[in-house]
């Protein structure tokens, strides 16, 4: 399994709740700082991360994302 963290910038107050509805997002919560929410994703293959981040970027109000992949 491959785990990644997606940082999301969005002015929407409920963006963390919306992120939980995205397929393969295991957890999501609001954060303070440069970004507004974090989505934790877990996939079978590294290439699937792009599919999940593309879904997140298509959400209305998402301004930008940054993805960090777990290194083992």
Predicted regions and their residues:
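A compositional/biophysical signature of low hydrophobicity enriched in polar/charged and small residues
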Residues: 1-72
């Amino acid at each position: 399994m491959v785990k990644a963290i997606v940082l999301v910038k969005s002015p929407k107050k409920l963006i963390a709740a919306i992120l939980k509805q995205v397929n393969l997002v295991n957890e999501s919560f609001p954060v303070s700082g440069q970004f507004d929410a974090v989505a934790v994703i877990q996939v079978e293959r590294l290439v699937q991360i792009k599919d999940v981040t593309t879904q997140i970027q298509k959400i209305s109000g998402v301004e930008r994302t940054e993805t960090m992949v777990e290194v083992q």
